[in-house]
Amino acid sequence: MDKFKRDGEEYISYQRRFLYPLLFQEDLYAIAYDHYFNRSSCFEPMENSSSNDRFSFLTVKRLISRIHQQNDLIISFLNCDQNPFVGHNSSFYSELVLEGPTVVLEVPFLMRSKHSLEKKNEWKSFRSIHSIFSFMEDKFPHPNSISDMRIPHSIHSEIFIRTFRRWVRDAPSLHLSRSVLHEHRNSSENLYKSILIAPEGNTKFFLFLWNYYAYECESLLVPLRKRSSHSRLLSYGAFLEQIHSYRKIEHIVIFSRRNLAKSIWSLKDSSISYVRYGERSIMALKGAHSSVRRWRYYLSIFWRCYFHFWSQPYRIRIDELSNNCSSFLGYFLGVRMNTSVVRIKMLDDLFITDLITNEFDSIAPIIPLIGLLAKERFCDISGRPISKLAWTGLKDDDILDRFDRICRNIIDYYSGSFNKDGSYRMKYILRLPCAKTLACRHKSTIRVVWEEFGSELFTKSFPKEGELISPFFSKTCSQRKRIWHSDILRINLPANFWQNKRNRQIETLFGL
């Protein structure tokens, strides 16, 4: 494919028109098998693997021949209950066949991404969960409102095909994708005849659909064409992993195509900071309340016209920071006033005044954290500690290690919040459950456990207040600065928990 990079037109023509023959190459399914095996091995222990999951290229070759004869055969193949061809291991091969078209569809997507990144990109973009902390540390001169959005994830299957046709001109590949999507739509589980996609998709195919769909949803924030925008030229760089993203746009004026004279959106004085985790996204806006409401109208019109569905009102909510806070991934986001003493000397006079500035701040919620510990049976709803009876059969070191990991996860996750007392309060709540669990294991009392293990018990398991993992920062510095720990394995777990909890609250509130 490198030879087609010399000529742009010929290169684009190749990547759009000749994808379907790749479906019948055995090497493609070898790559798909490697992707499937690597992903499965990360979540499944070795003792659960079976010899029945062995891969057979002969079976794949027969499937390729059948797909080559008629595309409709993939529909009967994807139905594992009615497909005796591959035997008892049909589920394994059905997922593998979905991996193959995904690898093919990723070819133009990767080329499109690389072609966009070769251009000058003036955006500051980050693609990991740590971009959320950069968002919380960002400087907002005058943040007035926060728009809490939830990206719709119920899309008609034909909408994906129509969006694919804009950059994939290979008709057989589109027909094959349509067959797969329509078969999924017509299954008994999808009563509304739509495709439910989410960032935590269990297959590579639906994860690719989410990445592409998120890219299309976020493209509305960018002035893609000069005729529809009048601003400093910003090139939009496509990215493959779109589970997490961070965008910041400044000084945008958006024009309507119908009537430029009357439909000018006065957003040139607004500053937008955008962050997304999964299907939830946050935009911090400044400006008048009417200007902020126009953004919600803009998003609703875009979803209705581009994806052909009505956006529910609960998916876009605007909170004014001056009145209340907004919750995102277990943090309360609000504005905190920072007062600075300024001395002004003019000739012989010295004036002292207070300079008040607003800072965008994150707060650790105390009551939800207590509710989280109560759900895991570490305390009751009032915060009174109780013993973990299920762990009494473990060794002392295992019990201490489990409590240590839980405490470390909470402290690391809220290490950069303004009120660090909330995370340290969770530490003291976990002290007594640890002691009670050890007391139940040894059939003694908490006093006996304390005398036996001594004060080193909690000193070893729990860090002291103000203690940092990194030795490069002093204790005085940690009290003044907010330091985010970058252990992504520990951070992702609380983030996913708060994300799912927030989604359930919204669905319960609106009777979904």
UniProtKB/Swiss-Prot annotation:
Database matches in Pfam families = Intron_maturas2, MatK_N
BP-aspect Gene Ontology terms: mRNA processing; RNA splicing; tRNA processing
Q: Which InterPro entries match?
A: Domain_X, Maturase_MatK, Maturase_MatK_N
A cellular component term, taken from the record's GO annotations? chloroplast
On whether Transcription is a keyword of this UniProt record, the answer is: no
Indicate where this protein is primarily found: plastid
The keyword Endoplasmic reticulum belongs to this UniProt entry's keyword annotation:
no
List keywords of the entry alphabetically: Chloroplast, mRNA processing, Plastid, RNA-binding, tRNA processing
GO-annotated molecular function: RNA binding
The family line of this record is:
Belongs to the intron maturase 2 family. MatK subfamily.
Q: What does this protein do?
A: Usually encoded in the trnK tRNA gene intron. Probably assists in splicing its own and other chloroplast group II introns.
- This protein is called Maturase K
This chain's source organism reads Ginkgo biloba
Taxonomic lineage per UniProt?
Eukaryota, Viridiplantae, Streptophyta, Embryophyta, Tracheophyta
